[in-house]
Regions:
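Structural alpha/beta core scaffold segments of enzyme domains
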Residues: 1-200
Length: 200
């Protein structure tokens, strides 16, 4: 086995001391003169129609400068390279717990948080689909009945199947025949993100 200089070796993290002592500066630590603080109201329903959003009490709170919802800007979707299926803020429906519904800009963080608590949302629950294997079986409701109209929809799979990636390389059957050991298993891993928090 090759003697690697980096892989498999312990390393001293140059930013470790700043992070463990709390001296590292993150974006949330930065305050500029006159800056407003923003807080989001997010959905506590996994799938529901939005019957109404009442922001009047939040807008009347002293120190609140602006309250916006998904209806306050042009309808635009974003998402992965494969499919643009998300909105900046929910309109008409919410599709997951934590989906943004409204944003409050206020003079300070406490006022913004108080304003978010004053926003009233009326929901109508819709059956939610949380098991990916059931979702692609065709035995559950379509999460997005209008999926084929979404930008980035490149494969006409229909239902809850938006795209498929085939990663076979070479002669798979021959690879199995030539293998001393074949392991077939289903693995469950935690969500990961390649966008790590970095000190400024």
């Amino acid at each position: 086995m090759a003697d690697f200089q980096t892989i498999g070796k312990n390393h001293v993290r140059v930013d470790a001391l700043e992070k463990v002592t709390g001296k590292a500066t993150y974006a949330g630590d930065v305050y500029l003169q006159g800056m407003l603080m923003c807080k989001l109201l997010t959905s506590n329903h996994s799938h529901a129609r939005i019957k109404s959003i009442d922001t009047s009490a939040a807008e009347a709170l002293p120190g609140v400068r602006c309250v916006i919802t998904g209806e306050d800007y042009p309808d635009a979707r974003f998402g992965s390279g494969a499919l643009k299926d998300r909105r900046i803020m929910a309109r008409e429906e919410v599709f997951y717990i934590g989906e943004p519904l409204a944003a409050v800009a206020a003079d300070d963080e406490i006022t913004a948080l108080e304003a978010v608590e004053l926003i009233k949302v009326e929901y109508q629950d819709i059956e939610h689909v949380v098991d990916p294997l059931k979702a692609i079986s065709g035995k559950t409701p379509d999460v997005h009945p209008d999926l084929e109209d979404f930008e980035g929809y490149g494969f006409a799979l229909g239902g809850n199947n938006c795209t498929m990636l085939d990663a076979d390389r070479g002669d798979v059957e021959q690879g199995f025949k030539d293998s001393d050991l074949i392991v077939e298993e289903t693995y469950h891993t935690q969500p990961i993100s390649q966008g790590f928090l970095e000190p400024m």
